[in-house]
Amino acid sequence: MAKLTKRMRVIREKVDATKAYDINEAITLLKELATAKFVESVDVAVNLGVDPRKSDQNVRGAIVLPHGTGRDVRVAVFTQGANAEAAKEAGAELVGMEDLAEQVKAGEMNFDVVIASPDAMRVVGMLGQILGPRGLMPNPKTGTVTPNVAEAVKNAKAGQVRYRNDKNGIIHTTIGKVDFDSVKLKENLEALLVALKKQKPAAAKGQYVKKVSISTTMGAGVAVDQNTLEATA
C-alpha cells in the first residue's frame, strides 16, 4: 500500500467521509486543512439527478458569483468593428478575428475565456478541435456567443463561472479561494445552487440535487448538509 502523506493522514483523521457537514463547519474544516504553499481554490461538486445520456437532461450555463472567484481572468474576444473597441474598453486582453485565430492555431493561448460575437463564429468554428477539448469553445448557453461582447467581458472579469454536468451527471466548478470570508463562500455556493435549480430539466425525475461536496485544490471533499443552505428553500 502506498504511504499516506502527512496531509492525507490529517485529512483522514479530521474528515468523516460518512457525514454531511453543516456548511459553516464544512468551510471551517476546509480552511483548517488548506496547508498548501499557495492560496487554494474552493471547488464544488454537485451530483444531479439527471440522465446525462439524454440530451434534454443535460445542465449547462453560467453565473456571475456575488463575490467573484478570486481569479484574474484573461479574456480573448473574436469580434470586429465597434464591438472590438467595446471589448477592449471592457478589459479584454486579446481582440481580433483571423489574426487572433492564427495565434490560437500557433498555440498562443494566453487566455482563460473565449467570447465571440455571432458574426465571428465563422472564424471560431474552425478552431473547434483546439478550443473544444480545453473547454474554451464559445457557446450561447453560457453567454460567450453574444452580440453584447462588452457585457460578456465584464461578466467574465467579475467572476462568472461556467458549468456543465459531466458524463456522471456531476457539476464541477469553483466558488472562490480558501482565503475568502466564510460568508462569501457560503453565498457563492448558494447562488450557484439557485442557478442550477432554475435549470432543472423537465424530464429529470426524483431528487434533483442529490449531493453537494466542497474541497480545496489539494484537499479531500467534504459533503455539505443541504438543509444548512439558504438555496434549499
Curated annotation (Swiss-Prot):
Keywords: Repressor, Ribonucleoprotein, Ribosomal protein, RNA-binding, rRNA-binding, Translation regulation, tRNA-binding. It comes from the Bacteria. InterPro entries: Ribosom_uL1_bac-type, Ribosomal_uL1, Ribosomal_uL1-like, Ribosomal_uL1/biogenesis, Ribosomal_uL1_3-a/b-sand, Ribosomal_uL1_CS. GO terms for cellular component: cytosolic large ribosomal subunit. Part of the 50S ribosomal subunit. GO terms for biological process: regulation of translation; translation. One of its GO terms (molecular function) is structural constituent of ribosome. It comes from Shewanella amazonensis (strain ATCC BAA-1098 / SB2B). Belongs to the universal ribosomal protein uL1 family. This is Large ribosomal subunit protein uL1. Binds directly to 23S rRNA. The L1 stalk is quite mobile in the ribosome, and is involved in E site tRNA release. Pfam families: Ribosomal_L1.
